[in-house]
């Protein structure tokens, strides 16, 4: 397999949906900054008004952080060890383009995170984007081009990459 055909982790997105603004959102941002080793989380805002949940359009309801490079790999390894107790991911967690995601119900499952009754417990969603070198040519603004089908990451390729790189079985 050539260097252009080898998949890699392009980015990891960590998302925490709180559902309300205020102290809970600030606590979630602090937890995320601590877990991601200093990556500054940005706020996500409600797209629509949902009166049943007391959410107005434009209200901050969550936070997210994007990690790339070595930080992304380190965080993903730590998160997979936390999530996959039996070293298993399911095929339904992978999409058609090779990306995969999973959720962690309690931030206290991460090493070094203790329960604090003043803060509470927060869950998070983690999405890993798997790409091959050369895929940027399809996304860039100037001289955008189509890419060969060999540069697309297939679902099976991504599963094989996760198994070989992180030692996680895919069922």
UniProtKB/Swiss-Prot annotation:
Record's protein name: Large ribosomal subunit protein uL5
Any Gene Ontology CC annotation: ribonucleoprotein complex
Functional description taken from the UniProt entry: This is one of the proteins that bind and probably mediate the attachment of the 5S RNA into the large ribosomal subunit, where it forms part of the central protuberance. In the 70S ribosome it contacts protein S13 of the 30S subunit (bridge B1b), connecting the 2 subunits; this bridge is implicated in subunit movement. May contact the P site tRNA; the 5S rRNA and some of its associated proteins might help stabilize positioning of ribosome-bound tRNAs.
PANTHER family in alphabetical order: 60S RIBOSOMAL PROTEIN L11-RELATED (PTHR11994)
Alphabetically ordered keywords of this record: Ribonucleoprotein, Ribosomal protein, RNA-binding, rRNA-binding, tRNA-binding
Subunit structure: Part of the 50S ribosomal subunit; contacts the 5S rRNA and probably tRNA. Forms a bridge to the 30S subunit in the 70S ribosome.
Keyword rRNA-binding in annotation: yes
């Amino acid at each position: 397999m050539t260097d252009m055909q080898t998949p890699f982790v392009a980015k990891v997105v960590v998302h925490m949906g709180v559902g309300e603004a205020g102290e809970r959102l600030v606590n979630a941002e602090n937890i995320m900054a601590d877990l991601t080793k200093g990556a500054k989380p940005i706020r996500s805002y409600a797209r629509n008004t949902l009166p049943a949940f007391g959410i107005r359009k434009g209200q901050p309801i969550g936070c997210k952080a994007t990690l790339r490079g070595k930080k992304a790999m380190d965080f993903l390894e730590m998160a997979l060890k936390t999530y996959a107790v039996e070293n298993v991911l399911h095929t339904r967690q992978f999409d058609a383009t090779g990306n995969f995601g999973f959720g962690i119900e309690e931030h206290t499952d991460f090493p070094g995170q203790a329960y604090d009754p003043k803060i509470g417990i927060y869950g998070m969603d983690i999405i890993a984007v798997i790409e091959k070198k050369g895929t940027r040519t399809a996304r860039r603004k100037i001289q955008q081009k189509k890419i060969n089908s060999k540069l697309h990451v297939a679902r099976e390729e991504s599963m094989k990459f996760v198994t070989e790189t992180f030692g996680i079985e895919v069922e």
